[in-house]
């Protein structure tokens, strides 16, 4: 339930509301407010706000994020409150946004490896919880130099401060994504390339010593061609740098790989 009131002026917008969440017959109230002011019309607007909510950490959500978690877990919901500010706008062929936020998270879920009982060589992950503050800095740029060409770049940096744990175990703090796509033949042939970078995450080895896993540097290219209006073929070549990395301790990711298939659109 998120009741809110929004007032629009000539160059400003004010939203005031509240986010009401419930869990185990308990109710939680979070702010849902934002103020935006157009400094230079659509070219530049500044904004500030407050928000929050209850992240319901059920087993499906957690196992989607980490497929190697244990089946028996102490599952708790995460309570999040955030205050933020930033700017956004459009300048010619460019759309941009930048934002800095401060979050307080109660029951932030962290992941540490443990030996599987029936197979000590295989790792599973237990959940740990901590109260954390996170400063998040993020920005994005989208450009259309010509109608057939689109370029995008997004980056984010999280600065964690934890109450109990030494590190944000298995949580990345930096991500960068870039994509270039070009429509070679209108509605028929497309080529694209992508870049994805992520810092190495902290974990603990079998002796309980702190360990920093390798970072990710992934470059990919691909193409798609529609033979008919609704039927086409695609080919993707991923991880051109053949980056060998463990996103989860003892579970290496796939190196250079090629994927092809059929595309359908309706």
Model-predicted regions and their roles:
Residues 1-10:
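Outer-membrane beta-barrel transmembrane domain signature of Gram-negative proteins
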